[in-house]
């Protein structure tokens, strides 16, 4: 199945609480969880690339400039049509600008079919995305969650998720990627809903939205 509606998220949350009753207080306090679903394609991937390693506020500011420059959520061709001066003024790091150009060229040429990739199983889809320089595991996982509706992905490399899991379970220090991955195994086949839950917990505890944007 895929996560395609708020009802799917609600179902997943109910199932999660049955799987792991420790999540019940979080679920009761934080539901309903947001769907956060975008159409598969260049705009969704680009939004996630922009979100890499920066605050949500910074990412949204940069994204707003991209949308303004391209006249809407950017198609690959519209992004490639931007001149160098405009791209330089978007606020992107050199690495992100390079990644966006590489991805846009691949999409425009047909060598990267983001709709088809979103429909693949997790391992194959991640393998096809991460061959592109600048698209790592976190970016691929978030794309599949929020543009493909994959129900069972937990991006353990996400610092906010690790902090939220550690806080919820009383860890003295933020758990590492391996520890969080092991904890999240218990939440199959709804790890993507668990990720939404812990992003919501992080936002509630810190007052800062950390879930990556793809819409």
In which residue ranges do the predicted regions lie?
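C-terminal accessory module of base-excision DNA glycosylases/AP lyases that mediates lesion recognition
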Residues: 1-33, 98, 122-123, 137-215
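Flexible, active-site-adjacent loop/turn segments at secondary-structure boundaries
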Residues: 24, 31-33, 40-43, 52, ...
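Alpha-helical ds-nucleic-acid-binding substructure associated with the helix-hairpin-helix region
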Residues: 3, 22, 26, 54-133
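A generic structural signal for residues located within well-ordered alpha-helices
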Residues: 45, 58, 95, 156-157
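A broad detector of the eukaryotic-type serine/threonine protein kinase catalytic domain
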Residues: 50, 71, 84, 108, ...
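A positional/architectural concept
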Residues: 11, 18-48, 53, 57-70
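A general alpha-helix detector
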Residues: 44-49, 65, 82-86, 124-128, ...
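Generic alpha-helical structural context detector
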Residues: 47, 51, 64, 68, ...
């Amino acid at each position: 199945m895929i996560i395609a509606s708020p009802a799917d998220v609600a179902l997943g949350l109910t199932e999660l609480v049955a799987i792991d009753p420790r999540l019940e207080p979080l679920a009761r306090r934080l539901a309903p969880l947001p769907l956060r679903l975008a159409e598969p394609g260049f705009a969704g991937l680009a939004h996630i690339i922009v979100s890499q390693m920066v605050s949500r506020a910074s990412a949204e500011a940069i994204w707003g400039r991209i949308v303004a420059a391209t006249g809407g959520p950017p198609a690959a061709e519209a992004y490639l049509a931007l001149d160098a001066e405009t791209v330089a003024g978007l606020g992107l790091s050199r690495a992100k600008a390079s990644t966006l150009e590489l991805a846009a060229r691949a999409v425009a040429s047909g060598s990267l079919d983001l709709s088809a990739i979103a429909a693949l199983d997790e391992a194959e889809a991640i393998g096809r995305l991460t061959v592109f320089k600048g698209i790592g595991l976190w970016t691929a996982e978030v794309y599949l969650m929020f543009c493909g509706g994959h129900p069972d992905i937990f991006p353990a490399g996400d610092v906010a998720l690790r902090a939220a899991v550690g806080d919820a379970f009383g860890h003295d220090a933020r758990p590492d990627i391996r520890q969080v991955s092991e904890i999240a195994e218990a939440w199959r086949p709804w790890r993507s809903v668990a990720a939404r839950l812990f992003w919501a917990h992080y936002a509630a505890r810190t007052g800062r939205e950390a879930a990556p944007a793809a819409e």
